[in-house]
Amino acid sequence: MCTLFIADLHLSEHEPAITAGFLRFLREDAIQADSLYILGDLFDYWIGDDDNNPLHREIASALKTVQQQGVSCYFIHGNRDFLLGSRFAKESGIILLPQEKVLELYGKRVLILHGDTLCTDDEGYQRYRKRVHTPWIQRLFLLLPLSIRQKIAVKMRANSQSVNRRKSEAIMDVNQQAVIDTFERYQADWMIHGHTHRPFVHEVPLHDKTVYRGVLGAWHHQGSMFKITDKSIDLISFPF
């Protein structure tokens, strides 16, 4: 058996091929795993569990089917779907996790997270993140009519794309000291995250040993997952 990790699918009604690829992944790959961990940005945006549109219902149903077949499904919020809540979790059968979680897998300590908290050089984004994770701001936003929330989400998405085009590639990647500090805080052997869309396995020298940082790819033109067994940890890309 195995444990699977994915992130950054950015599912939306505008990308039906990605949705179809994810549904196929659930039917063919996830169903054979012990557990599936979704490390954020499953959806391109999330404006509340009451946005019960056909895509959300389809994904919830597919995840529920996997869970009913005995595969535990876990979710860590990303920067696009941090408002995903308990109602969707109940409908889909997923288990919501904190933003950082250590797993004991096959004799290794594996830290999982979305990854945006490691990008500390992007000070503008970190200020934004702090604001939108403020509980009273979230509560106020969720009280707005759904149509208003949809308009705000579209405007914020367009603004984010415009701002990111003006940022350097380096500033949007992880800060190495933040990575080291996080490894030390959790005493992990491996770290797996998404967010940066730069799939790779990095060796990180740490005191008298080497630890590993695995980065998941985004599901733009192909799927990306980490597969962990008792014998190996593999970063795998696959066609939709």
Curated annotation (Swiss-Prot):
UniProt keywords, alphabetically: Cell inner membrane, Cell membrane, Hydrolase, Lipid A biosynthesis, Lipid biosynthesis, Lipid metabolism, Manganese, Membrane, Metal-binding
Recorded metabolic or biological pathway in which this protein acts: Glycolipid biosynthesis; lipid IV(A) biosynthesis; lipid IV(A) from (3R)-3-hydroxytetradecanoyl-[acyl-carrier-protein] and UDP-N-acetyl-alpha-D-glucosamine: step 4/6
Cellular localization per UniProt: Cell inner membrane
Residues binding Mn(2+) 1: D8, H10, D41, H197
Leader sequence residues: none
Any one GO biological process: lipid A biosynthetic process
Entry EC number(s): 3.6.1.54
Binding site for Mn(2+) 2: D41, N79, H114, H195
Reaction(s) the record says it catalyses: UDP-2-N,3-O-bis[(3R)-3-hydroxytetradecanoyl]-alpha-D-glucosamine + H2O = 2-N,3-O-bis[(3R)-3-hydroxytetradecanoyl]-alpha-D-glucosaminyl 1-phosphate + UMP + 2 H(+)
Requisite cofactors: Mn(2+)
Protein name: UDP-2,3-diacylglucosamine hydrolase
